[in-house]
C-alpha cells in the first residue's frame, strides 16, 4: 500500500514535532504548529494534514529509543519515583499522574503533571503555603475539552545534588473523578493513581 501525499506530510510533521518535544521540551500543541510551519512553509495547514497527539507520541517514543536509549529509561524511572513521593504528600487531594511521565515518553525536559480532585482548590493552595512551597498559579484546559479551564499550581521540587524538577498540579472538582469521564475526543482520560504508578516502577525495575 502506498502512502498518500497527505499521509507522508502528516508523518513528516509528526516526526519534526517529536524531535522538538524530545530535544527542547516543547508541548504537543506548539510543537505541532512549529513543525507544520517548518514543513509546509506559508501554506495553510489543513486539518487532515496535521497528526494527532497519538501519532506524535509514537514518534517521541521512537526518537527516545533511537537517540536517548541509554539515558531515557533512568530519567523516566527517576521522575516516576519523584511523582510517587509528591502523590504521597498530596494523598488527601486524590492525586493522579498524567502526561509524559505516565505514558513513558518523559525526557530530560519533562515535568511531572498531576491531576488533583478535591472540593476546594484553595485547600491545596493553603496546604502548599503551610509547607513553604513557592508556587505559581495559572490555568490549564480541562480534560473534557471545550472552553473549560482548571486552576493549575506549579512549583520546583528541590533535588539534592541535581537540578530541581518541575511539578504541575491541575486542580479539578471531586465530581470530575466520578463516572467514565472522557476527553473531548471521546477517549478515556489517561491517568494513574499512586498504586498504578508504583506498579509501573516495579515493572521497570524487573
Please place each PLM-identified region on the residue numbering:
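Catalytic core of pol beta-like nucleotidyltransferases
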Residues: 2-25, 29-108, 118-206
Amino acid at each position: 500500500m502506498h502512502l498518500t501525499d497527505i499521509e507522508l506530510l502528516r508523518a513528516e510533521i509528526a516526526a519534526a514535532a517529536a524531535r522538538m518535544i524530545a530535544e527542547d521540551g516543547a508541548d504537543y500543541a506548539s510543537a505541532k504548529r512549529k513543525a507544520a510551519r517548518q514543513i509546509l512553509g506559508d501554506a495553510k495547514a489543513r486539518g487532515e494534514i496535521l497528526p494527532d497527539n497519538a501519532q506524535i507520541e509514537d514518534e517521541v517514543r521512537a526518537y527516545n529509543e533511537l537517540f536517548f536509549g541509554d539515558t531515557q529509561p533512568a530519567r523516566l524511572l527517576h521522575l516516576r519515583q519523584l511523582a510517587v513521593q509528591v502523590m504521597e504528600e498530596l494523598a488527601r487531594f486524590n492525586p493522579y499522574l498524567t502526561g509524559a511521565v505516565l505514558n513513558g515518553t518523559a525526557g530530560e525536559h519533562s515535568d511531572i503533571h498531576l491531576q488533583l480532585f478535591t472540593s476546594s482548590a484553595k485547600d491545596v493552595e493553603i496546604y502548599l503555603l503551610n509547607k513553604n512551597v513557592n508556587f505559581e498559579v495559572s490555568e490549564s484546559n480541562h480534560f473534557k475539552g471545550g472552553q473549560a479551564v482548571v486552576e493549575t499550581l506549579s512549583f520546583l521540587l528541590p533535588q539534592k545534588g541535581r537540578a530541581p524538577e518541575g511539578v504541575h498540579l491541575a486542580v479539578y472538582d471531586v465530581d470530575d473523578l466520578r463516572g467514565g469521564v472522557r476527553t473531548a475526543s471521546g477517549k478515556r482520560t489517561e491517568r494513574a493513581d499512586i498504586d498504578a504508578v508504583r506498579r509501573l516502577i516495579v515493572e521497570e525495575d524487573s
